Amino acid sequence: MDVFNRKAMEMMTSPAEREAFDITQEKDAVRERFAMHPWGQQAILARRLVERGVPWVTVVMENPYGVGGIPWLKEGVYNWDSHAVNCHIFKDAKVRFPLYDQVITAMIEDLYARGLDKRVLLVVTGEFGRTPRLTVRPGSRTKVDQPGRDHWPRANFAFLAGGSMNHGQIIGSTDKHGNEPVDRPVKFQEVFATLYHCLGLDATNTTVKDHQGRPHYLVDAGSRPMRELVG
């Protein structure tokens, strides 16, 4: 049994770990503040895990429909893949965005109220941006034309809170169409370097060996933590 298998077994058999996953121990008011749908309850679980020393937790906000009191929406989409063939982007957003806003604001307030903001960094992001212009296609479920947005790697976002960083600022901007960066372009390698910095890792010098024993750096050459946040 290698070190990873041993750690997995310890996690599954530890009474403390089982207790961390029991979110019914949370006060009803706290659970309701986050919202009783899966996104809110998963966020509470994430906080309970970091309270117990878990260094990295991922919450995937997918499929808000049909559970937690959220009715199924024919024009909605399982994830955030808002192509016109998948969803009516405006109808989907009217359901999805208020849920997102409630969970994220509740998480930030909760972390600060518990004093966790000094050692916990909350990062909210996606895999890439969306086209500045809408496309219109027949929906795969609705069979009628509906608006959507396709993949757009030229501009994206990352929202950060906590982690003892310099917050209250917007770093970088795009043109008025959300098409291209025009001021302080930020590469995601800089974001990654910033996250490693928060974890206490020197991303510019630390390497990880692959299965052939070859060293790989954690970030691309020249990538540094964002000076606006950690300087």
Predicted regions and their residues:
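Ligand-binding pockets and gating/stacking loops
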Residues: M1-G231
